[in-house]
Amino acid sequence: MAVQWLLVCHGMMTLTVVISFLCGQWPIFKGTPFQWIHYFLTFGAYDYFLRFVGFVFGSKGTDVILSVEYFCCDRPNPILQVIYIAIMGSTYFLTAKSSFIYIPGYYLGDVHKYTSFLAVIVGVILFLLTCFSDPGTVNAENVSRYISAYPYDDIIYSKKECSTCKIPKPARSKHCSICNRCVARFDHHCGWMNNCIGERNTKYFMAFLLWHFLLCLYGTVAIGFILAGRVKELRVVHILTVYYGVDKSFRSLAPRVIQWLVGTYNTQILLMVFLAIVSLLLAGFFAYHANLCLTNTTTNETFKWREYISLNKKLSEAKASAAALKAGMSCELKKPSAESKCFGLCGRSSAREEEVKADAIAKRNLYDRGSFQNVSEIVFPLSSRPSSSNKSKRKSE
C-alpha cells in the first residue's frame, strides 16, 4: 500500500510541476500555487541564486554569473544543442543496453530493435533541419518579397524601419537581438535549436515536436510492453497468488507487481517515467504551437496582443478615474443629483466597454484565413510562392 501511495504522490507532484511550468502564467491560475511555482521555475529560482552569489562572493561573483548568462541566453551558442545530443544518445544507449536483451519477448517482436534506431535517426535529422535551416532572414535584397507576403494591420504592425538593420520591417517580422537579424513571421528564438523559428522553418520545428512526442511515447509504451512481457514470462502473478496467497484482485496484485518491477527492473522503470514526462511536455508544446498554426498566429503576436489589451485596459481605467474625479470635484459645488450619482457607474461601464472592444479587435486576426489555408502557409510559405515574387516585382517597378 505504501508503494502505491508513493507512486500516486509522485504522479501528482509531476503533474503539478508540468502544469505549472506550461500553464502557470495563464490568467485562470492568477493568485494560485500554480502561478507561484511557474514564477519560481522560470524566474524565482535564478533570482534567489543570483542574490545568494552576490551575498557570498560580492559584485564580482554576480558579474561572473551575469556574463555566463549573457553568453548562454543572449548570444548564439551550441550548449543546448550539445545537451540535446547527449540526452538523445544516452537515453537510446541505456534503453538498448538494459532492454534489448528482452527483445523479442512475449509482446514485442525483433523488428523493434531496428524501428527504434530508425525513429531516433529521423528525430536527429529533423533536429538538424530545424537548427540549420533559414528561418526567413530579411535583408535589403529580399525585403520587398517579404513585405508583399503580409499586409500591415496598423494595430500591432505598422510601416516602420528596423533601427538595427536599417531596412523596412515587413508585417509579422521581428529583429532577433540574439541572432542580430530580422526574421519574417517571427515566432520565437529557440535555444535548443540555436536558431530562430520563423516563416521558413516553422514546418520543421512542428515536425520536430510531433516526431519527438511520438518517439518518447513509443519508448514509453515499448518499455511497458517489455516489462509486461517479463511479468507474463516469469509468471509473477501466478507465484504471488499461489505461493504467497495474494488475492487475485487488481487492488491487491498491482502494488506487489509494481514493487517487484521497481526492485528488479529499476533502470527500465526510470527510463519509462522519464520518457512519459518528456512526452507529456512535448505534447503540451506541440498542442500550443499547433493551435497557433491553425489560427495563423505566432508566439510573438500572442504577447503583442496581450500587451495591446493590457495597455487599453490601463488607458480605459485612467480615463474612467479622471472622469470620476472630475465629477466628484463638480459635486462639491453642486447638489448631488441622480445623474451625478450614477456617473461613476457609467464611467466604469464605459471603461469595461473599451476593454471588450480591445479584446474583440485582438480576436479579429487579419491573417487568419481558415485552418486549411493557415496550415498551407506553414508548409508552403507565402514569400516562397511565385505569386509573392510577382507582387514584389510589380511594387519595385
Curated annotation (Swiss-Prot):
Q: What is the lineage of its organism?
A: Eukaryota, Viridiplantae, Streptophyta, Embryophyta, Tracheophyta
Give a GO molecular function annotation for the protein.
protein-cysteine S-palmitoyltransferase activity
Q: Which PROSITE patterns match?
A: DHHC
Example GO biological process = positive regulation of response to salt stress
Instruction: Name its cellular compartments.
Output: Endoplasmic reticulum membrane; Cytoplasmic vesicle membrane
Under the heading PANTHER family, the entry gives:
PROTEIN S-ACYLTRANSFERASE 17-RELATED (PTHR22883:SF286), ZINC FINGER DHHC DOMAIN CONTAINING PROTEIN (PTHR22883)
| Active-site positions on this chain | 190 (s-palmitoyl cysteine intermediate)
Q: What is this protein called?
A: Probable protein S-acyltransferase 17
Role noted for this protein: Palmitoyl acyltransferase.
> What catalytic reaction does the record list?
L-cysteinyl-[protein] + hexadecanoyl-CoA = S-hexadecanoyl-L-cysteinyl-[protein] + CoA
Keyword Cell inner membrane, does the record have it?
Answer: no
Recite the UniProt keywords alphabetically. Acyltransferase, Cytoplasmic vesicle, Endoplasmic reticulum, Lipoprotein, Membrane, Palmitate, Transferase, Transmembrane, Transmembrane helix
Regarding protein family, the annotation reads: Belongs to the DHHC palmitoyltransferase family.
Q: How does it sit in the membrane?
A: Multi-pass membrane protein
The record's comment about this protein's domains reads: The DHHC domain is required for palmitoyltransferase activity.
